[in-house]
Amino acid sequence: MQTKTLLLCTALLQAFTVYADDFTVASPDGHLKATVHLTNGKLSYTVSRDDRTLVSESPLGLKASMVDLTENLELVETAISSVDDSYTLPVGKRSQYRDACNVLSVLTQKGTWRLNVLFRLYDDGFAFRYEIPKYGGHASAYLTSEASRVCIADFRSSTACRFLGNSGGNDPNYPYEGLYAKYLSWATLTGTGDGRYNTPSLIFNGKDYMLLSEADNRSFFCTSLMKAEQQEGEFSYSWTGQTKDYATEKDHRILCPLPAYTPWRMVVCGDIKTIFETTMAENLCPPTTMTDLDWIKPGVAAWYWGGSDGGKGEIQKAYGGLREGEWAHCELAADMGWPYYLIDAGWSSSWFPDFVTRANEKGVDCLLWQNANLNNSQDFSNANMDATLKKWKSWGIKGIKVDFWEDDSKETMTRMENLYNTAAKYQMLVNLHGCTRPSGLRRTYPHIMTQEGIYGGEQQFWNPKLNSAQHHLDVLFTRNVVGAMDFTPGDFATWRGSILTQRSQGHHLALLTLFESGIVHIAESPENLRYFIGRDIMKRLPATWDESILLEGNPSAYATVARRKGNDWWVSGITVNERSCRVKLDFLEEGTTYTAYIYRDGSCRSDMVFEKKLVVNGNNLTIKELSEGGFLMQISPQDNLDVPPERTTYEAEATANMLSGEAKRKTYSSLHASGGGFVGDLGLGGKLQFNRIKAGHTGEYILTIYFISRDTRQAKLLVNGEQVGDTITFRSNGDCTSSWDPDGMSWMMIPVTLEEGNKNTITIQSFDDLWAPNFDRITIHPVFSDDEATRILPTTREEMFPINKVTDLLSPFNPRKADAYSLNGSRLTESAPQGIYVYQGKKILRK
């Protein structure tokens, strides 16, 4: 680090100017200026960019129980310094960081107490913090409040998340897991709740964006909220307190040993590209003292709780138990080449160590969920944290997800920092949940991989309509700016195949790289991903980046982001309304030919298509995005990466198909249904026969049926006149849209055998006394390149886990030998010819 210091009382050079009681510091590029005023014993400041006021005169100062440091202050000295430091991090939006700023220090005194105000000016914003030096014989201070304000000079709008209340308050929701909203007037901002908002909050003044947040939240202080005061544009800082019971405390004092510091009050200033690309939060934190960082490895993780739609009991029962469900998802991580598997709530020390050993044999490392208070009789208090992590380290655990902090008081910040230090001692990665937002501490503690503090993807299981494209834009330009965000993307469909999302499949795939997180927890099941069109690109997914740039962005409409890992670029885009996105490829290296692997919206939200194009620097790609749509593409110098097999779509309502009985073609304009219609009223023995199904070769193909059903229904499936299985059970759309709205779409994937040519038929026939669902379309594609040549799969989701617990057979925890069983249809029997049998992609050898 290069640091230069100069007392202002001796000289001021270049960008630094002093006027009597005014002390000015400029950013390194000279465009941004902050002036600290000392007038009649009171401190205040203003900020401008190119002589245009961003922050009008705003008060400064602290109050303590022993002294009021907001008035009657006398100047001791002022100093200026500069910082120009470069550093690397193993995780983040970039690998190379530069911390370049100019610093102003204004030291004042009142009696035997001193107050130092530190300002940092970066090219992309400013920050200030307080220091109470150890002086006058004082060893500590009880701080009670601060006078700091950020008075926006020309307030136009704010994108902010209302504070919902700590666990000690009246609201049961954790404060950082609410939705952001756009406030177009100061009156609506002050009139919502108690006027307090989480940070970060995004402000717009008609020309500039300003992101208000904090940096360097550690054990020495609590975090703060932003409170909208009655004066338009005026934000104050509201502390979260000394202890977790702050909401019921009568004494709100914060005890601080001297020297005492507050976190940095941070304001990023500039256009929306500047907001997205800033690394100011990391720059404001101290460098790490850790010397060995080689063990810190970002990556993608499978996650049973997310893959089972939030740990729903019916799914756990279907797998045969929690342990068996966990193992199925651990094998998903192995199959996808992901380095991690997260074991969530409910694990037991009676089986977990063996689970980790077997996972390691498959090349998967395990992460462990832990309640911040108590879980499985493990004492996670400060006193016993070391012993607990030492034991988990002996089990082979690589990282921990610590949940339910539900507080960000000084007491909790102290406990979190104890966790950071203890986890570093045992080389364990850290993921915080039920917690506050990040504050740049991955510079100090690089093993902090990600954290929650977000209304994330898991909310899809309960409130699918609220996790909208607008919400995703809101958090992209607020919460994810200040640090890694464990959004838990995926959610393409529920375990039973219901497409709960109101966004497109392309949109949900885009979120995998649109958001930044050192551990990307995929909320999906093995069943959904086995034949998913995005499977190949998900196998290659990075979790940390060498470079991140915003190609285009409007916080109320759309965003297109490019992130680089090595020689490959990953470009993702989302939108609120339908649009054509023009991606300028001027960020590619000149002279190199790349291949773009593009996954984009298809004909409707439940449809996604793949295409492959050669591109070079200077090319433009135009990609159509549906409303609530999106895309993801990997641009690589390699032209031979795995791609999904070609899919062919057949509309149910097409005139080439044969309908019989009560079945009818119906016209409907739908978000998730394609082709403008569907086939309904299929009952009482009626048939829907898809004709002219084409196959390039004789062999196994994957049939995906898109259907609409408010309740569970059954039918027969016939391929070329021969029935597949006994009964196909179509599960209810569940919590999708109500009634028989085609926007409530589900899918089912079934292996079938087709003959070469275009004369294959696929028939769905209702039973004589039953009604089948409504049908939108089917798709046909060959098996993936890494699938078995022959695969025998159950034909219904009920039979996927039959009474004899096929999953037990495949689980390493079951003492029964696999070679004692064979497949008969989709069920196992006690005797069979010798050979290899396949269930869910797992080989079963009968000797």
Which residues fall in each region the model found?
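An acidic-aromatic substrate-binding cleft motif
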Residues: P257-L332, M336, Y340
